[in-house]
Amino acid sequence: MSSGRKSLSIGIVTLLLAATLISPAWAQDQAEPLVIITQIDTSQFPSVTVYISVTDEAGEPVGIDPSRLLIQENGVTIQPDQMQGNAAVIDSLTTMLVMDVSGSMYSANKLDTAKEAAKAYVDQMRPGDQTGLMSFNTEITYAQPLTADVDQLKTAIDSLVADKDTAMYDALVEATDVLDPVPGRKAIIVLTDGMDNVSQNDLGNVIARIGPSGLSISTIGLGNPEDQSATLAGIDEPALIELANRAGGEYAYANDPAGLTRLYQRYARVMQSEYAITYTSPGELRDGLTRQLTVSLAETNATTEAAAYNPGGLVPEVGDPASWSMFLTALAVLLALLFVPAVIGRLVSQASSAKLPSPRKRKPKIKFKDKQV
């Protein structure tokens, strides 16, 4: 073998060995799962339940040992009271499908496409799951209250008709109000093909309406987000992305029926595969202070997910009942300092008035007109 061929062979072997050594590390970095806090339920505070999705680069759920999920509240590592997920599947999922039925959905069979995709989502419901349907154009219609009846849901979906303008934010406010008293994992999936142009509410109102039990909002844009030249075809993609990011959801868009159906089905798979961790907050009082949460995945370089919650409390709670007597005493002193000067001033004024001689009352002068003879 010539020296040239020998050198070439050695070079090839060296490259193959280097690729073998580098590839696993590179693949591991590329395959780090994405951890997202989708919902924080503080309705039973100081017991807090955090719902977490773990997905791969394609957005598909990843199965892990729940004990690998590490949670910190205000920098304090949490010891969970209960963990669900993986083998212990989350009991139930409540979803509100919010669908755009404005006039633009009539074009290019968009509404028919959306109906078929929504029915594909309904087909993935498990025993214990329930779904509702709300449609919006200029008006908001609660087309189907929450139910586990798949056939009833499909009938409601088929009844939708496209007309008028778009009031997406108003519909989302209504949907959050409906879901507020519902316990457990709950989510809104909203589909639209255009821009909100008649709502009385905005994105901030929607986020503010999410109550202590929390929920997530995922958004779907139907159409081509790069085509803003036509009013009926343009999607307000920045607004949909911001809404999903702020509400613990996900944004995606579809240009065709098959893609839209796959999106709905993937959203269902991800939510049904989430993890729920329940713990007791280190700060057990509803003191109105915001708590910072972080979730990370042990033994990986996955990005740490951060979120925040506020347990509420207009009047801060007092941990020691004996402190109430101190509080009431302090309140009484403050009230005394507020009212005593006013009372003393009034008494002094009355005493001064009593010493002064009362003025004589003058009889009124009556003037008569002279009679003319």
Tell me the role of every PLM-derived stretch.
Residues M1-I12:
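Bacterial N-terminal signal peptides that target proteins for export
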Residues G11-T20:
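Bacterial N-terminal signal peptides
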Residues A31-M96, V101-A108:
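Acidic, polar low-complexity linker/tail segments
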Residues S23-A27:
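Sec/Tat signal peptide C-region and signal peptidase I cleavage site
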Residues F45-T49, I64-P66, I90-M96, E116-A117, ...:
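Extracytoplasmic
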Residues Q350-V373:
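Cytoplasmic C-terminal tails of single-pass
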Residues D41-P46, N245, N255-S352:
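C-terminal "exit" segments of structured domains
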Residues L93, A108-T113, K119, D123, ...:
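Exposed acidic/Ser/Thr-rich ligand/metal-binding surfaces
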